[in-house]
């Protein structure tokens, strides 16, 4: 017997999922998958028992400048006026932001899907809000397997990448392999 899911699709105008390796890199593109701790955070925020699977698609990237301030404070003394000023150094970092991200979350029950369908999510940062759109869709496991998009298959092995540390498992390393079905860029444009 095949597993079936109740699928809620979230959409938004843009989204940036900060890679765990990017601290103050001059140019950083959004991660195109969700880590185990991100999914766990979403599960807790939605108040559901389980998020079984997900797929993430988008329409491409837009590089946008983001002004940041350093943690340190510079002290500057102007001797003529006997004036002391304090400033924080600024820099502009370029971010490759996903345009029109679509996040398909698969739930095991209609109850969890309905609960999720009434709430918004943030992909990673508070400003990257995605809202549920369209009806809750029933999908068999086979249909969901064919859904275009990218996801991280949570596993540790020779081909696995380290994708960060889990805030929910005492900082344990998280590993996975990227799983791409179809074209994750503009894959849903026709079906929106």
Give the ranges of each region predicted by the language model:
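Beta-strand elements of well-folded, non-transmembrane domains
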Residues: 10-14, 58-60, 107-113
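Short, well-structured hydrophobic secondary-structure segments
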Residues: 36-66
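Acidic, low-complexity glycine/serine/threonine-rich segments
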Residues: 30-34
């Amino acid at each position: 017997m095949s597993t079936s899911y109740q699928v809620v699709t979230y959409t938004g105008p843009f989204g940036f999922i900060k890679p765990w390796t990017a601290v103050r890199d001059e140019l950083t593109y959004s991660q195109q998958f969700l880590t185990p701790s991100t999914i766990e955070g979403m599960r807790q925020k939605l108040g559901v028992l389980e998020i079984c699977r997900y797929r993430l698609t988008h329409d491409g990237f837009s590089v946008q400048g983001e002004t940041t301030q350093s943690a340190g404070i510079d002290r500057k003394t102007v001797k003529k006026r006997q004036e002391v000023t304090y400033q924080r150094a600024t820099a502009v970092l370029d971010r490759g932001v996903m345009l029109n991200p679509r996040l398909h979350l698969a739930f095991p029950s209609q109850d969890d899907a309905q609960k999720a369908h009434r709430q918004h999510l943030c992909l990673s940062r508070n400003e990257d809000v995605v809202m549920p759109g369209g009806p809750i869709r029933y999908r068999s496991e086979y249909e969901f397997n064919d859904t275009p998009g990218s996801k991280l298959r949570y596993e540790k092995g020779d081909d696995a990448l380290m994708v960060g540390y889990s805030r929910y498992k005492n900082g344990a390393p998280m590993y996975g392999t990227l799983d791409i079905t179809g074209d994750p860029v503009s894959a849903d444009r026709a079906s929106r």
